[in-house]
Amino acid sequence: ASLNYWAGQLKTGAVTQAQLIDLFMEQADFKDRYGPLVRLYTAYFRRIPDYDGLMHWYKNMYPDRGGKGLSLSEVSALFSQSEEFVLTYGELNNLAFVELVYKNVLGAEPAGRADWLNRLALGLSRGEMMIGFSESPENLNSSRIPNSITMAFAGMLRRAPQNVEHAAWLVELK
């Protein structure tokens, strides 16, 4: 629907401001595009994605002029080779990578370490492994509120929340 339509809905009281925000946040083209990218960012770097970085990767995944953008798997592979990742964690062997993923994404000890090491040895990429964790039911559940805050700031304010803002909203929404 157009901007005029939603403005009319607000003006007539058909929806409240809060309801409109909820409607926008639940739109598939917003939630299904930004959500996986925000979760992936958080899984790799354990921080709120900066707005410019988030938009850079979003635009690479969903180019304005059509055409084929990067897949989430390709972005994940690039994250695993990024300067920030290497400077933060160093060069990691597969065991260290598996342990890092469990810690960063699930905050848990690597209970399935042997299985993931075997999958990596058989050719699973680190990027695909990270997506498996960032899109896991456990992470989807535990990251829902924090990532919703980040996505709301990006979608409505065109910026990332500052850490103090993010923390305040976490307290408010939990």
For the regions a language model picked out, list residue spans one by one.
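Composition-driven recognition of low-complexity segments enriched
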Residues: 1-174
